Amino acid sequence: MKKASRSVGSVPKVSAISKTQTAEKIKPENSSSASTGGKLVKPGTAASLSKTKSSDDLLAGMAGGVTVTNGVKGKKSTCPSAAPSASAPAMTTVENKSKISTGTASSTKRNTSTGNKESSSTRERLRERTRLNQSKKLPSAGQGANDMALAKRSRSRTATECDVRMSKSKSDNQISDRAALEAKVKDLLTLAKTKDVEILHLRNELRDMRAQLGINEDHSEGDEKSEKETIMAHQPTDVESTLLQLQEQNTAIREELNQLKNENRMLKDRLNALGFSLEQRLDNSEKLFGYQSLSPEITPGNQSDGGGTLTSSVEGSAPGSVEDLLSQDENTLMDHQHSNSMDNLDSECSEVYQPLTSSDDALDAPSSSESEGIPSIERSRKGSSGNASEVSVACLTERIHQMEENQHSTSEELQATLQELADLQQITQELNSENERLGEEKVILMESLCQQSDKLEHFSRQIEYFRSLLDEHHISYVIDEDVKSGRYMELEQRYMDLAENARFEREQLLGVQQHLSNTLKMAEQDNKEAQEMIGALKERSHHMERIIESEQKGKAALAATLEEYKATVASDQIEMNRLKAQLENEKQKVAELYSIHNSGDKSDIQDLLESVRLDKEKAETLASSLQEDLAHTRNDANRLQDAIAKVEDEYRAFQEEAKKQIEDLNMTLEKLRSDLDEKETERSDMKETIFELEDEVEQHRAVKLHDNLIISDLENTVKKLQDQKHDMEREIKTLHRRLREESAEWRQFQADLQTAVVIANDIKSEAQEEIGDLKRRLHEAQEKNEKLTKELEEIKSRKQEEERGRVYNYMNAVERDLAALRQGMGLSRRSSTSSEPTPTVKTLIKSFDSASQVPNPAAAAIPRTPLSPSPMKTPPAAAVSPMQRHSISGPISTSKPLTALSDKRPNYGEIPVQEHLLRTSSASRPASLPRGPAMESAKTLSVSRRSSEEMKRDISAQEGASPASLMAMGTTSPQLSLSSSPTASVTPTTRSRIREERKDPLSALAREYGGSKRNALLKWCQKKTEGYQNIDITNFSSSWNDGLAFCALLHTYLPAHIPYQELNSQDKRRNFMLAFQAAESVGIKSTLDINEMVRTERPDWQNVMLYVTAIYKYFET
């Protein structure tokens, strides 16, 4: 703490002051006191504190230093030789505390371990020098000044390295959460208290050392020059050693500066990579605050009080970037390298010193040139220290809070994206199953279409039959247009069948062509492989023949060698026999010599025996050598015979194997040749087939070109119908918009709805009775149909004009009633399977409103325009007010009794069937046909099994009709079946989009805004709450924790329920209660707990998003 809170007066020194001090203090400052601070400045000294030099460490250190050292300013630190040894436990405590800090790099740990070793060795040297100086008992005023300079240097080195570590610590601690920071602050507060105790202890020790050394504490700075001269008088012999030590220190400091420059560059690159910059500046208020704390006066006392003065200020030093200060320090050392004064080092190290504020202040401080000539007064430094620390803490807290918000928003967005991906996977699976189901239904519809086509042909044949009967009875008729349209329908159906068959045959022929081409390619590839195999086999056969020839040559050479060896053995045998005979002769001679010796002169015999003995030995040695040669020759002959036998066996085996391989290769070659011939014949046949298929394909292309012209006409008709459908959808959207705009008025009539339940029950019973009556009328109509069919056969001979008009009008009316009943029964079945299976207040009031409009029969016959609303899209009565019901009762009344349908029965000539059979042969309703609201329900039929079953039931009912009824229904039944077709309402894309929007209301919002659903809903909320005060929606957690966002969002729709101008962010419970009550008043159920929302600062974003989605779904879909 003593190093961290040094005086500011020694920091903002200018170069002129440094040079003046150098001139004044060069001799007295180079006293023997330099031996006490020999190599105090080491990288490890600052590295041992590097783990705890984050922004919170420096703030705590600064606060602790200011509170303790105000009482000792202005005093001269004469003997701080015990300070390094006393600061060693402090550094140990810092190291122990730093073990719990997070985000420290591995390089800092290595520097810390190195710094511990160096600091321990430095402490040992300082203790020895302190003992030597105490034994001499010399005046130590200069020694105190020298120690002061060393302490300043150590502090400046610590501060410089702290700044470097600070930026690194900031980049490492950016991602730490709030709980870790709070724990770290508590630990640093404990550390500050410990440092306060250590400072008090060190101050006591300093006083004791001054008392022991006899230094007068009341010396003024004016007596400094006389004290230095006295010190020079007492210590003339220590100057040279001090100069050498200072030179060594200069060299070491220069090396350390280079090392710190490299580290600074690395940290700057790292900060730039993280998005920060060392060229950032404080804002205007912080600059003004920093300038007010400066003063244009610098006293010599403020320049000389060193480690003992601990009244440092945050804004009083010369601020600047770390690299600029390091470069200044290096330049100062190069300029004053030969000055050899302690004060020179003091001024240089004070320039290096940085204000020990947070890492943000170190990065945002202005350059040193802005405040280089502005010194400060002690009082202004004391006053500005606490304020600057508060500003730094506030700035750091705000940045930490902003980082936390960004981190939570990012994590929230990632979770929402993952959840949407899972939903998309599920939707994909559902769409696949839906596609399969639609495929099955398509097959059913195709079968039904085929049956309808058969029925159409059957009906056309019956019409021809009835027409022939009319011709026989000489009854005139004018239905040429109908006949033409029927024939055209038949021709068009046949054309569709022919086009489908042609397309199918073309695809089949193309498949056959592709198959044949693939087969041809495979045959060519097999032929190529066979040729390659034949070549390889031939090459192998030639190789085998060459091996056989080489083996035969080797065998002949071995045979020649064997003959030579045999001749050698025979000659050796002859030589051996000759030697044996010679040996026998010699033995006889020896025997004769023995006999002569026994009988004659022994001396001559002795010589002769000696000569004979020598000849015998020579002969024996020659015989033994010959025998050895013979044995070797025999062994060689035996070995060669064995080798020859082995080679002969191998040669025979190889010859047999080669013969077998040659036979196999010949067989394979024959087989491949036969296969190749077959492939060639197949290839020629395939080419001929391909040529024929190409001709057929050209013919089919010409037919298809002709077909496409007709199909284009049909597609134009389909596009017109789609335009009509889009117009109707826009009209439906306008009705929904009106319903939302007038929903506020409906809330005033909710009390009246309670009294209408009894009336609704009565209406329901009346409706049930009416349904029974309609069923009874249906049965009677069917009986009348049978009776009229019999009467038709009886009155064929009456007048043609009267009978024709009456029969056609009546049968048309009956068919209209039957179609209306079918549609009404289908509508009742759909309503029974809707989202509200049980009768509720809304459905009862809806039936009551519709029943109240029964006396107006004219509305039932109004033909619907393309912009008129669909009956199934009519809003429920519970969602509109009585005034709205009266205003829109005309165009959207849906449940009028079916008896009104019989009042408006159009004539047969008014139905333009031929036009729609001409334009909409595939799946379109007759647009110009007048129909009632019950007929319009066919538009909303979806493709389902129920529709196919109804089709089959209608077909079976039509099969059982009499021939007379078929004549009347022959031209209208295709129209009815086509108008009730499930595919006549909307396209599959529109249906799937409607289903998707009903299932997930955020899909349309995501398509509108782009991006994910979460981001789209967030943009929608921002757009709706734009212009509201105190509203900043950036996520779904902390942006909604005060309830104002909910109130603003609902205020856009329900301004009468929420007095937004009276709300404030402090009363959270009231805000949430108002918002939830307003939402519940329109039917939005609250899924959030008020107590939990009030208690937590960051609620669960998924629950909040679900509730906001419910609000969007209610008001926007």
Curated annotation (Swiss-Prot):
Highest taxon listed in the record's lineage: Eukaryota
Keyword terms, alphabetized: Cell cycle, Cell division, Cell junction, Coiled coil, Cytoplasm, Cytoskeleton, Gap junction, Phosphoprotein
Gene Ontology annotations for the cellular component aspect, listed alphabetically: cytoplasm; filamentous actin; gap junction; microtubule organizing center; spindle
PROSITE patterns found in the cross-reference section: CH
Transmembrane segments: none
First-listed, main subcellular location of the protein, grouped into a coarse class: cytoplasm
Basic and acidic residues bias: start-end ranges: 120-131, 158-171, 946-956
Entry-linked InterPro entries: CH_dom (IPR001715), CH_dom_sf (IPR036872), F-actin_Monoox_Mical (IPR050540)
GO BP of this protein: actin cytoskeleton organization; cell division
Start-end of Low complexity biased regions: 45-90, 358-377, 971-990
UniProt region (Disordered), positions on chain: 1-176, 293-323, 358-390, 919-1001
Regions of compositional bias (Polar residues) in chain numbering: 93-117, 293-303
Subunit structure: May interact with both microtubules and actin cytoskeleton.
Annotated family: Belongs to the cytospin-A family.
PANTHER family, sorted: CALPONIN HOMOLOGY DOMAIN-CONTAINING PROTEIN DDB_G0272472-RELATED, CYTOSPIN-A
Function: Involved in cytokinesis and spindle organization. May play a role in actin cytoskeleton organization and microtubule stabilization and hence required for proper cell adhesion and migration.
The protein, known as: Cytospin-A
Organism: Pan troglodytes
